[in-house]
């Protein structure tokens, strides 16, 4: 197969030619992205000239807010008016509606319409630019009523008018209550709205001072061409498209996949009213996009979701299947991880999905990580393999054994196409300010907090970040009904069950529902102890935090996500819990002092009542003995 230059196939939009990158290095980009069969030689590139290292918004076209002129502020929303080619960056959680003109976001053009888009822009990730653009629709848009409502003169030279509102999940930014180190995760006090006293918004306009401290997202030409090619192939294929992206740590895998999702779901022809969908296989338990922490999953995404950015797994897409790994790293339980991956991809094959799918993989490309990549490659059988290359990973990628052809449930025989493009380390959120630097462990802890403090019972995520010890846990019986099995590592199998139960207090466990009944165990009131290999009949439901165990009355006091309570009740009384390595957030066991002082309700400490004459220790504060006077 002859090599094909993707530049010739990429869509050329007159208003988007200068949005792929703001750096001069991309203008001088010499290496061409190549697509070929695996058995053909791949061309190399000069990594120093291709990497985009200047991820800053140009001051020439930067939006400069001025209240009363190009910015109108109301109680629950703001109106932003942009002239031609003006661009800005917004952080936080917000809903966006285009009232006039259009905008460019990640090289995707959007027209004014009645649609509302939902954005999740934490400062732990690189922030995409929002750039004004023209209206390219066929239908007339009447904006006169909108102008009248906001006292905007109809005779203005603004190309784009945006309405920005608080996100329905505004309470997600309150995570700093338990983790003060994340106080600048979504917005900072130095940006426009916060600095000028408008503190009721869940978002902010990032000012130049903050822009110098954070990373803005810029998609290079090589990435743009590759993304467009993948979309083009999917649109013109009568079979399914399976995309596997391989790269090292901070190479931009998650960013590339997020851009691919947006390209596939939201970059339609103007007249196309159909709903697009794709399947997302989340195989990175340490940095999952949609899974629970320490889990892998298969998720269905549709163009009706309208979600952009990093939602920390709170965007509420349809999770089709989920497996608990028990650790953020596949390295801790490698056999278990590979078994779960095999099960998940088997579930994917059984769906007979004829659209586009992609895989989010860990950035482990050395040693056993290569074995994982090889195994996933063999069972997923990708139609397209994207290598995010850097000088340190090219050698490891060459060790992968790519078959010349695959056969799947959807196609009898096909050869995988390969793409070698440079990794974009410049898009990694390497922030300069100590206040907006976030360790991966802090982000993992935050995801756990979001899971356990989600308080909604609908598809609109809401959060209550009061400490869990200030709330009453749920009671789940154990023994004959309720939780009838504890699953542990094989090395603890001989530990007596009553000691295991006590050891679970204060730990995070996985909660399963046993789909097949065991009549023999139904007659026993004791709880079973099984090894991790005995999970064939169990379905993972959610994570739980064990508060305490009442061995006399035989029930667990356990915290579970509020939005999962109804699901657990509907499933009946046959549950299993599994303890592995997921760590309990320390801030749940010992919340910041100011949090406990401001909490007006008594924390749930114990279910035991003292006996009538039971001694109570009382601390005397007025003791002044000789030994105390030094």
From Swiss-Prot:
Principal subcellular localization: nucleus
Function (record text): Polynucleotide 5'-kinase involved in rRNA processing.
Top-level EC class as recorded in UniProt: transferase
Disulfide bonds: none
Source organism: Candida glabrata (strain ATCC 2001 / BCRC 20586 / JCM 3761 / NBRC 0622 / NRRL Y-65 / CBS 138) (Yeast)
Keyword Nucleus appears in the UniProt entry: yes
Pfam families, per database record: CLP1_P
Record-listed ATP binding positions: 247-254
Enzyme Commission identifier(s): 2.7.1.-
Keyword terms, alphabetized: ATP-binding, Kinase, Nucleotide-binding, Nucleus, rRNA processing, Transferase
InterPro entries per UniProt: Clp1/Grc3 (IPR045116), CLP1_P (IPR032319), P-loop_NTPase (IPR027417)
Protein family according to the UniProt entry: Belongs to the Clp1 family. NOL9/GRC3 subfamily.
Protein name: Polynucleotide 5'-hydroxyl-kinase GRC3
Database matches in PANTHER family: CLEAVAGE/POLYADENYLATION FACTOR IA SUBUNIT CLP1P, POLYNUCLEOTIDE 5'-HYDROXYL-KINASE NOL9
Highest taxon of source: Eukaryota
Positions of region (Disordered): 1-52
Keyword Zinc-finger: no
Entry GO terms, CC: Las1 complex; nucleolar chromatin
GO terms, molecular function: ATP binding; polynucleotide 5'-hydroxyl-kinase activity
One of the GO biological process terms: cleavage in ITS2 between 5.8S rRNA and LSU-rRNA of tricistronic rRNA transcript (SSU-rRNA, 5.8S rRNA, LSU-rRNA)
Localization, UniProt: Nucleus, Nucleolus
